C-alpha cells in the first residue's frame, strides 16, 4: 500500500521542483499518511510539502453535531501520529465538554443522534467505523479515540465484519467515485451538472483551510 503511493508522490515533488514557482506548496492527503510523510522527508527533505490527515477534523465535525454547535466553536487537544491519536480535551467556547462527549461516545460512538453524516464518510463501512468507537471509548476511559484505533485495538472484530467480496474500495468506486466520474462525463458532454456531486464535505473544507493558511 505504502509502496504504491510513495513513488507517485516523489514524482509529483520532482515535477513541482522543475515546473512550479519556488514558492509552491503541496498539500498531501495520500495514505498511508505516516509512511508517505516519512518517505517524502527522507527522499526529498527540502520539498515544500504538508503531509496531513483530516480524520481528527472529521471527528470534530461529528462532535459538533453531537453537541449541537458549529465545529469552529470547538477547541481540542489531540496527540498521536496521524491516525493513531487521541483527544485529551474538548472545549466548547471555553467550557470543557470532554466528559459529556466521553459518556455519549461510550454509548453511541461518534454517530450523532440524527445520523447526519459527511458525504465523504457516509458509506456503510464509515458508519460502522464511527459506531465502533463506542467499544474503544468504553475500554479506554481517559481519552477520546481516533476512529482508526479500531484497526489497532479491534482487529478481530474488523476482520469478522468485513466482506472480502465487497470491500470498502468497492463502496468508494460504486459511490463517491462514480458520482464524480458521472458528473465529469456530464460536464464534458455539455449537460447540466449537479455541483453537489463534487462536494468534499469536511475533507474539502479542511483542504481549503490549510491552503489558505
Predicted region positions:
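Catalytic cores of large soluble enzymes that bind and process phosphate-bearing ligands
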Residues: 1-8, 51, 55, 202
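A structural micro-motif
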Residues: 24, 47-48, 74
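A structural signal for short, well-ordered beta-strand segments and their strand-loop junctions
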Residues: 26-29, 51-52, 78
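Short acidic, glycine/serine/threonine-rich loops at helix termini
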Residues: 38-42, 62-63, 88-90
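Acidic, His- and aromatic-enriched active-site or binding-groove loops in soluble protein domains
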Residues: 46-63, 67
Amino acid at each position: 500500500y505504502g509502496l504504491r503511493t510513495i513513488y507517485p508522490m516523489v514524482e509529483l515533488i520532482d515535477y513541482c521542483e522543475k515546473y512550479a514557482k519556488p514558492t509552491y506548496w503541496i498539500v498531501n492527503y495520500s495514505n498511508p499518511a505516516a509512511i508517505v510523510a516519512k518517505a517524502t522527508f527522507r527522499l526529498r527533505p527540502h520539498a515544500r510539502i504538508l503531509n496531513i490527515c483530516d480524520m481528527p477534523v472529521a471527528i470534530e465535525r461529528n462532535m459538533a453535531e453531537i453537541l449541537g454547535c458549529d465545529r469552529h466553536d470547538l477547541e481540542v487537544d489531540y496527540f498521536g501520529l496521524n491516525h493513531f491519536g487521541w483527544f485529551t480535551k474538548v472545549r466548547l467556547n471555553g467550557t470543557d465538554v470532554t466528559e459529556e462527549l466521553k459518556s455519549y461516545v461510550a454509548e453511541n460512538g461518534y454517530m450523532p443522534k440524527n445520523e447526519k453524516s459527511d458525504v465523504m464518510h457516509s458509506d456503510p463501512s464509515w458508519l460502522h467505523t464511527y459506531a465502533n468507537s463506542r467499544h474503544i471509548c468504553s475500554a479506554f476511559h481517559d481519552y477520546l479515540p481516533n476512529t482508526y484505533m479500531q484497526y489497532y485495538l479491534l482487529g478481530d472484530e474488523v476482520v469478522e465484519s468485513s466482506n472480502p467480496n465487497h470491500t470498502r474500495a468497492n463502496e468508494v468506486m460504486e459511490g463517491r467515485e462514480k458520482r464524480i466520474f458521472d458528473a465529469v462525463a456530464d460536464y464534458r458532454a455539455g449537460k447540466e451538472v449537479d455541483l453537489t456531486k463534487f462536494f468534499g464535505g469536511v475533507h474539502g473544507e479542511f483542504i481549503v483551510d490549510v491552503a489558505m493558511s
